Amino acid sequence: MVTRSSHTEDVIITTKNGRIRGINLPVFGGTVTAFLGIPYAQPPLGRLRFKKPQSLTKWSDIWNATKYANSCCQNIDQSFPGFHGSEMWNPNTDLSEDCLYLNVWIPTPKPKNATVMIWIYGGGFQTGTSSLQVYDGKFLTRVERVIVVSMNYRVGALGFLALPGNPEAPGNMGLFDQQLALQWVQKNIAAFGGNPKSVTLFGESAGAASVSLHLLSPRSHPLFTRAILQSGSSNAPWEVMSLHEARNRTLTLAKFVGCSTENETEIIKCLRNKDAQEILLNEVFVVPFDSLLSVNFGPTVDGDFLTDMPDTLLQLGQLKKTQILVGVNKDEGTAFLVYGAPGFSKDNTSIITRKEFQEGLKIFFPGVSEFGKESILFHYTDWVDEQRPENYREALDDVVGDYNFICPALEFTKKFSEWGNNAFFYYFEHRSSKLPWPEWMGVMHGYEIEFVFGLPLERRVNYTKAEEILSRSIMKRWANFAKYGNPNGTQNNSTRWPVFKSTEQKYLTLNTESPRIYTKLRAQQCRFWTLFFPKVLEMTGNIDEAEQEWKAGFHRWNNYMMAWKNHFNDYTSKKERCAGF
């Protein structure tokens, strides 16, 4: 039920936990009602730190859902102080462990049975919050008359620390947070005019990886209908870590903060008593090598949310049977290069040498054998025009983008479609006119989001007319997909987006010109990453060990030879002495 009191324009809705008050926002000559900061779980404080989220109890008053809630505790990116390009991703509300809240935007007048789109933010499972300006749901709600929902979930050690098998810190808490928010939507969205049987998950980067994990997690299956994955998938190399690795990282963190003991329960108890800030300061040191794309604490195969590695589940077809829409941006790698790859800077053109390219490979592929790195260098060298100055800069962008985002996303889509599900793939190639990063960084990771959420529609923000048209077309396709399982909807005037099949692999380009259809995106490079590179690792992964063993063996043999020689000399001198009698 909705009641309006005329003087304050507040909107009150009754949920299963109690009444909440929303706020009316003017959007493009109409109104959207927003409910910001609705609690969906008990605050994970004290003894609940590191545990799965617990359901909420009821409240008796009216909950004021008129402003964004706290963001979850996380480290802040301070690499480029005062620079909007990096700071736009930093939390814009207070940080707290009390952060399990969600937001709902509904059209007015209140719809009946509207399609729901649930956004899951990215940030490598280490950072992120639902209150960022680029995730504002009001434009999408107003233009497409869908209900938009977004939730905060725990990140970093507080969201993903794991001692596998121990209920005190089972791992994947951040994913269980998301799952509980999906349950909240199932129970409550009808009161907002939403249809619980028409729910599409969408997310970017680690958010898209999360969406694809919900596709692989049986408990999530009844909680949504369809899925959109922007620049991320669960089979990416940075995505899921083994139980062994997760456990080691927990023990390393415990050591750093002075919680090392034999007893696991004692370790967790000790970690619970530490200040959140101390955990944040130390969690960045748990990865033993200096890598630029490291997920310190992230999803694990816990046997509960995730029963096996994503690759295996995809192979076995253990996934939700539904439609997916997946895609990537043209320059997925550049965003990571300016955070420490040799020779790269946001303040110059970052023309790098072959040597710097090789140094870069060391940073992005720690632990990979020399032969492995050599094979990447060989595959990504432009042998036709070796002297072109931009070559190595573009090559490292491609290496990082192909390996971490583009090829895993294509592979996921291919496998998913092989199980008889309709899939649609896009390639986003428009560089926003508002992009604060330098020209050479191209169409960057994360910069399609503003077009999905309709930011270019706001006239006073100074996007170009062509960008407004592109944004409207993307919003229309995303909403069509959410409503009907097909981005084409009913209009015939725009380019039809073909279904992606594992044989032809057709995809659509998204840009300010007219969209085009191509086949087999980056086929050559992705064959390298999915087929050749794993073989190289398999064959050479233990070359270093073999070399060590050989050296040790040679050393032992050398010692035997020396000993034998000494014995022999000893023997001959004695023999000579005997012969002289």
From Swiss-Prot:
Example GO molecular function: cholinesterase activity
Organism: Oryctolagus cuniculus (Rabbit)
InterPro entries attached to this UniProt entry: AB_hydrolase_fold, AChE-related_enzymes, AChE_tetra, CarbesteraseB, Carboxylesterase_B_AS, Carboxylesterase_B_CS, Cholinesterase
Alphabetical list of Pfam families matching this protein: AChE_tetra (PF08674), COesterase (PF00135)
Glycosylation (residues): N64, N113, N248, N263, N348, N462, N488, N492, N493
Gene Ontology BP, a term: choline metabolic process
Subcellular location: Secreted
Main location: secreted
Active-site residues (renumbered): S205, E332, H445
Sites of Phosphoserine modification: S205
Gene: BCHE
PANTHER family for this protein: ACETYLCHOLINESTERASE (PTHR43918), CHOLINESTERASE (PTHR43918:SF5)
Cysteine pairings via disulfide bonds: C72-C99, C259-C270, C407-C526
Task performed by this protein: Esterase with broad substrate specificity. Contributes to the inactivation of the neurotransmitter acetylcholine. Can degrade neurotoxic organophosphate esters.
Tissue localization of expression: Present in most cells except erythrocytes.
Main enzyme class: hydrolase
Name this polypeptide is given: Cholinesterase
UniProt keyword list: Disulfide bond, Glycoprotein, Hydrolase, Phosphoprotein, Secreted, Serine esterase, Signal
Catalytic activity: an acylcholine + H2O = a carboxylate + choline + H(+)
GO cellular component: extracellular space; plasma membrane
Binding site for substrate: G123, G124
Residues of the signal peptide: 1-8
